């Protein structure tokens, strides 16, 4: 199935001291007549492969396909956009109207909002706390003003642990957010780092939903000449952080088994590297996982944005059952209709598509039912 590949996350031409814009150093957003919210991909990179055609509309959507829940939908509160500009970055083009239009085009009834990278951390504790609060309140207001159209994954000011614990309480108890949105790494620290244990212990106590989104890792930039880091490293950073939870010294995956993780992009490279995870346990012989790492990753959830090609689905479904898959778009960086087309092209049954499109999301977050 041919798709038009939009560009990747725009950012600075060089990394900041605090890695605030660790998502792409290769390009700036441009306006395309068909959809000004899409980003320009590296020029000519995929044209030679015959993958340059525009995404076609989903034809003859069924009733179930008109009630999708999108769990990977970014928004940009004005205060976040201002902070990005202040620190030398550029926010993606976003508006409430453009979000709703993209949702309607692809039959998305409800989108769960999460901040566009890099979130709220720019190196200053007080700024991070203030931004997290302001962005979360903005998202909660969008949800209130548009009944049934939005959910919310609240932002935290990590790596500020104390501020994050306060924001968890406010976001979940006061704002009634549907879950928490985190990034795969913060500077040199991945989610399994010991520094983040207090945050995950609190999330575990609450049996919280935790949606994760990759960033461009501090360790790996410009490894392939002319290829933006997010083309490769986003998927790999997801796998790194899952490994940190399972194999890290803190043992977060074992200490906090009730955190309900959603991993972006069909798990990144995890489905293709699971054999290496298995081998790691053969060597380690960790008594906490006598059956290896597979039971751990099988209980996690995976959304399908930029992870809906046939080969990606096939690999992911060798690892987890359909009950662990969720619909996601990665808007505004990609259109929801792209994921919808990918889902329809794969030989899922109607019941399986209904599970991915809506039912699993409602099972995990019943508040999205309205």
Regions found by a protein language model. Give the residues of each.
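Aromatic-lined glycan-binding groove of carbohydrate-active enzymes
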Residues: 249, 259-293
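Generic enzyme active-site microenvironment
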Residues: 211, 263, 328
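Active-site gating/metal-coordination segments in enzymes
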Residues: 113-242, 248
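Active-site gating loops and adjacent loop-to-helix segments of metal-dependent hydrolytic enzymes
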Residues: 15-28, 74-94, 123-124, 129, ...
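Acidic-and-aromatic substrate-binding clefts and catalytic sites of carbohydrate-active enzymes
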Residues: 92-93, 121, 158-164, 187-194, ...
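Histidine-centered divalent metal-coordination motifs
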Residues: 72-74, 213, 265
């Amino acid at each position: 199935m041919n798709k038009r590949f939009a560009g990747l996350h725009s950012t600075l031409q060089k990394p900041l001291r605090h890695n605030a814009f660790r998502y792409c150093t290769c390009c700036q957003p441009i306006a395309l007549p068909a959809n000004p919210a899409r980003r320009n991909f590296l020029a000519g990179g995929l044209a030679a492969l015959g993958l340059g055609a525009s995404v076609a509309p989903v034809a003859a959507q069924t009733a179930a396909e008109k009630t999708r829940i999108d769990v990977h939908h970014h928004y940009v509160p004005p205060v976040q956009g201002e902070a990005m500009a202040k620190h030398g970055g550029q926010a993606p083009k976003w508006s409430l109207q453009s979000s709703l239009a993209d949702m309607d085009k692809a039959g998305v009834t409800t989108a769960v909002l999460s901040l566009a990278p890099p979130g709220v951390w720019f190196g200053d504790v007080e700024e991070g706390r203030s931004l997290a609060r302001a962005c979360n309140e903005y998202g909660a207001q969008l949800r209130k003003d548009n009944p049934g159209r939005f959910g919310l994954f609240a932002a935290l000011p990590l790596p500020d642990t104390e501020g994050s614990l306060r924001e968890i309480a406010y976001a979940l108890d006061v704002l009634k957010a549907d879950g928490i949105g985190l990034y795969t790494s913060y500077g040199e620290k991945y989610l399994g780092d010991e520094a983040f244990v207090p945050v995950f212990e609190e999330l575990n106590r609450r049996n919280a939903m935790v949606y994760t989104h990759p960033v461009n890792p501090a360790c790996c930039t410009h490894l392939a000449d002319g290829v933006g880091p997010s083309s490769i490293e986003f998927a790999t950073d997801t796998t790194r952080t899952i490994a940190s939870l399972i194999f890290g010294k803190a043992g977060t995956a074992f200490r906090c088994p009730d955190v309900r993780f959603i991993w972006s992009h069909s798990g990144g490279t995890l489905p293709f590297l699971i054999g290496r995870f298995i081998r790691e346990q053969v060597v380690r012989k960790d008594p906490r996982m006598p059956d290896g790492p597979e039971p751990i990753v099988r209980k996690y959830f995976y959304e399908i944005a930029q992870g809906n090609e046939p080969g990606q689905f096939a690999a992911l479904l060798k690892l987890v059952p359909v009950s662990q898959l969720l619909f996601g778009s990665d808007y505004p960086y990609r259109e929801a209709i792209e994921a919808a087309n990918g889902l329809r092209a794969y030989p899922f049954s109607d019941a399986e598509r209904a599970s991915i499109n809506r039912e699993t999301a409602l099972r995990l977050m019943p508040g999205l039912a309205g």
